[in-house]
Amino acid sequence: SFESYNEITLPTDYREFLLASNGGRPTENTFALVGHREDASDVSFFYGLDHPMESLELQWMFDLNEGYFADPVFDNFFQIGHDGFNDKICLDLSDERFGAVIFIDMVPMWKDHTEKDIYVIADSFTAFLEMLYEAEDED
């Protein structure tokens, strides 16, 4: 399995989500960003297993992110998706916050990212899904 191959344990609610939907683009995709310069962001895509587009595949993303950040504060983050600006939506797999959903502000891409770029969005993947809403169209 993906977990045994990568020697990680995923939260049960996220594992069940993967088995039921295998990622994808949610209709209700907007979430609040507390403490960020933007009020909200969106889920452009949740990655899946064996996705035909390599850049939307969990294993490809897991391999890409291995060692991506110099700061060890990022070591326990597992990227599950991205927003419209390619910011990272992750699960925290650490003992302290296991299963929490994390937003990493990747703007600008070329800077060294630190703890200041991390925003805890929800305590669990289920709580994150429950807070998603459909954004109103801006005219």
Predicted regions and their residues:
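Intrinsically disordered, low-complexity regulatory segments enriched in Ser/Thr/Pro
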Residues: 97-110
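Short, surface-exposed beta-strand/loop micro-motifs that present aromatic residues
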Residues: 88-93
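N-terminal non-cleavable signal-anchor helices
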Residues: 35, 44, 102, 121-122
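Compact, glycine/acidic-enriched structural inserts
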Residues: 107-133
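A surface-exposed partner-binding patch
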Residues: 1-87, 135-139
